Each structure stands twice: as C-alpha cells, then as structure tokens.
Amino acid sequence: MPLSDNLNLLWSSLIVAELVKNGLDTFFISPGNRNAPLISALIHEERSVKKICVDERAAGYRALGHAKAAGRPGVLVCTSGTAPANYYPAVIEAFRDEIPLVILSADRPPELIGSDANQTIVQPDLYGRYCRDSLLIPCPSADYPLEALLARIDSLIARPVGPVHINCAFRDPLVPGIPDSRPIPDELLATAGRLYAREGAYTTYPSPGTLHTGLEDVEAILNRTARGLIVIGRLDGPRDAPALEELAKKLGWPVFCDIASSMKGRIPSDRQIFSLDHPEALRLVSAYAPETILQFGSGLVSKHYFASLLPHSEATVIQISPRAGLRDPAHRVNVRLSMPAFAFVEGLHLQENPSLDATACCLFLDSLETLYQALQRRIPEETLSFSRIASDLLGAVPDGEGLFLGNSLVIRAFDKFRSPFPRKISVISNRGVSGIEGNIATSVGFAEASRRRVTAVIGDISFLHDLNSLLLLAQSATPVVLIIINNGGGRIFERLPIRDFPEILEPYMTTPHGMTFDLLAAQFDLPYFRAATPDELRKAYESALDAERSAVLEVTLDPEEDLRTFQTFQNVRLP
C-alpha cells in the first residue's frame, strides 16, 4: 500500500483497512473525483470486495439487500454533493427496519462549504434523525492522531443496528502519486505502517452474542499478566463496588480509585495508588510499567491518566463499561466490553495467577507509601489549604453518608488522597461536563432520594452560581451540611498556564468578590459556622453534624498560602 504518496491516501488506506478488519469487506462504489482517495485505497485493499455502481440511489438499495442477506453492513462509497443525498431512501428504510448500513462519503474541505463552490452542500447531519450515528472526519492532517481516527471508526460501527454515516473531507491532491506540499513526517509514516499492519481492529467490541468468547480472551490476558493495574472511575450501580473489591483481591494488582468512584474507602489503602495527578506518583506508575490495565467506569478527575500515562504505555487496555459511545480520550483502549462491572466479574473464572510478579508489585506499592507519607508531612498542620481540608474531611465524613464534591479545585484536591480507614461513603459529583452551577440543588436532590445526610463541599464561585438553592437546602427533610471554601474567587486559574498573563488572570479569570456568606445563611434561617484553621474546621464540622439539620460552614483560606502549599506538595520527589 503506497501510504507515503500523500496524507489523503494514507488516511483513506487506514479508514478502509479498519472497516475491513471489522468484517465490513464489501464496498459499493459510485464514481467521483472527491472520493478518488477512497477508491484508490480500495483498489490496493486486496481483502475488500468491490462492486461498481453508477446510480447512488440503486447502490443504496443494493447495499441494503446485501446487509439483509449477509447480516453485516455493506459500505457505500460516493463523492460529494447530491451523491450521498441519493442514498436517503435506502437510509430511511435501513433505519426503520434496523438494517446495518455504512455510508462513506467524500466531502469538500470546510473553507468551501457555504462559498458557492461547485458540487458542495452541507453534508454533516445530512440524514438527520434517520441516521443512528455519524462521524465527521476532518481533512487529513499530520497533527491529528491516527489512533483517534481508528478508535472513532471502531466505536461508530460497534453496534450494527441501522445506518451510520462517515463523512470524509479532502483537499487536493486527490490522486495517488502526487505528494503534499509538505513531506509526511517519518514518525507519522511509521505509525501508519504499524497500524495498517495490525491483524485486528484497533479497538475490539465483542457483541452481546460473543461476550462469552470475549470474556475468555480477557481471562487469558489476565492469567498471563505479570504486572497489572486496575483503574476505577465513576461506577453505574450498587452491585459494582463489592464485585470490584472481590476482583482486586483475586488479582492482587495495584488499584487506582478515582474519588468519584466511591471506592477509596473500600480498597485496602496499602493496595491503592493514591493519585495519578502527582508527578512523582505518575512517574512511579510509569516505571512499574503495567502490562495490562483493567479500566472500569467512566471519566476520571485526573487528566494525566489519559494525557500522560496511557499515550506512553505499551499496556493492553481493557475497558469495561455498560455506557454507549466512545469513552477513550487517549484512544488507547484495545478491548471494550459493553457490560456492567459486576457482570464482568461474575463472568470471569479466574485462577491463582502464576504469572503475577509479586515482587515488582510490592516494591511499587512500597514506593507509593513512602511518597504518600512524605506528602502528608508537607501539608501544614496549622494553616488551612485545599490539601488539608481534603485530607481531614475524607476521614471525618460519617460512614455510610454522602459526600458531594464541587468541580474545579475541590474535587481535584480530594482525588489526591485516600481514605484513612475502611468506609463506605457515596461520593457524588457533576462530572458529565464539569459545570459549577446547580451544586447545592444536586446535593439536596441526592440527600432527599437516598435519605442519607450529605456533606457538600463546593467553592465560593460555585456557591454564588446556586444561591437560589439555599431555599431548597433550608427546606430539605434530609440534612445537607454545605461547606463553602471561600478563597476569594476562581483560583484554579492560578494553577494553569494563564497565570503567566496577569492582565488576563485578574479580574477576568479569578473574578474576586470580597464577600462572606453569613448573612445569606441567616436570610434562610440556616445554622452558620465559620472556620479559618484546621482545628476550627474540625470543631465547626462536628457542630454542623450535631445540628441534625441543614447547615452552612464557610471555610476561609488565604489563596496565596494555599498556592504555596500546592506547589510544595507537587514538587515532592523520592530520593
């Protein structure tokens, strides 16, 4: 395959090959110039069956008939303009009858859309509600990760029920043999060659009918793994947590529990990776070099698992999640099992792992423990900081109750620590899109439905976003202890690159307000407490719990002192 001709052909070759690796080997090709890169790739793809179709409308129905007989989709390949529109009747039929169909359309580059360029329409979302899903592939670029391209294709076609649309934009040159204006980087060519030569799909999604086989394959991987790692994100049901406790015992692998997993108090602390956000902890994980990573749940607070650890790891990544869609920001998942965590654990038949490298595991966990104790010693005892608040409250929230964590600095601080002793606390957070509004209302809603008291820890800006929910707080039959960390504004920006631009940082980012919140609590007849030291926080929190009704606890801290503590904390290294 002439991958080196130009980026259009390189991308087209990978797209076509990935479809073939997923079992989609029959292509219904209609002629055109804009889809020439796709046709060129198909000509060189010996594993593909190519059927030439003059009329796209008839091609659509031909592919529909193929899918009805073969039980898997045919792939329709066309140029831009009215060509993909001619598939519409067949697309509607496929949608209503749940027949798998893949449309692979070429498109003009975005700068030509809406410019009166010839043979150009707005092709994204062309089929509207009659398309199960769609993927917009941008013009080929050396800066776009090829792994992301393949992972998105695999995710799109993993559930073959109804039509899906892959729309590929291309700039010139559209034909093979003509190079781009800039040579393709050697590193990109090497990556493309490696991905093209892979025997199977980049990410495999065993279907419900083949989950048993998928589990057997995973069992084999687990049983031959010497150094493994379990990563637990937000879980989906009450049966998941005890199942993962049991799995962690059986495997004997180190475990990272995201704070939102509610698992920090359920996995023994001497088996836990306390943080993936601390540079030295991340270095230790990388040096441990896990061969297999089992990833449960969705989302992680720390971006470094996806941004720093996975891209440089050679581990086989197995993701277990019942949620639909691509959930892989690093585009590194090798096997995706669409099932609840508890069902995965129940379906496994694990034996004692003869391959486990217990020595490497113990050395790794011992180093983590040494680092954790060093970090604890660096947190000032007499002054408040996010680190001190998080460390203390993780041991103070009563067992069996709820802990709501606001976004921004709050949840990141709690994610860096482990529970000091075993406990079952339900951690609640709004991490879907990580907004800072509605935090108080969410806490009240959880407390009312679960009939369990909730301690809600939020920042001052989050509090100001949801002032009207103080009425809900006051009226809640189940108490919510609202802890507001008042550091005078949105101080997370002082830890981001924008800090180097003071003319932007303040007031535009940090939005300082100079307020305290005692009078607001009084307005709603809520008990109010204030703390400015660790000792005051402990006493005030105990008093708020003793009130046995909703209460407000305002914690004031010096943002400059807190920033110094954070910087000292992050700079700790092992000898």
From Swiss-Prot:
Disulfide bonds: none annotated. GO terms for molecular function: 2-succinyl-5-enolpyruvyl-6-hydroxy-3-cyclohexene-1-carboxylic-acid synthase activity; magnesium ion binding; manganese ion binding; thiamine pyrophosphate binding. Binds 1 thiamine pyrophosphate per subunit. Signal peptide: none annotated. Keywords: Magnesium, Manganese, Menaquinone biosynthesis, Metal-binding, Thiamine pyrophosphate, Transferase. Its cofactor is Mg(2+); Mn(2+); thiamine diphosphate. It is an enzyme of class 2 (transferase). PANTHER family: 2-SUCCINYL-5-ENOLPYRUVYL-6-HYDROXY-3-CYCLOHEXENE-1-CARBOXYLATE SYNTHASE, PROTEIN PHYLLO, CHLOROPLASTIC. Catalyzes the thiamine diphosphate-dependent decarboxylation of 2-oxoglutarate and the subsequent addition of the resulting succinic semialdehyde-thiamine pyrophosphate anion to isochorismate to yield 2-succinyl-5-enolpyruvyl-6-hydroxy-3-cyclohexene-1-carboxylate (SEPHCHC). This is 2-succinyl-5-enolpyruvyl-6-hydroxy-3-cyclohexene-1-carboxylate synthase.
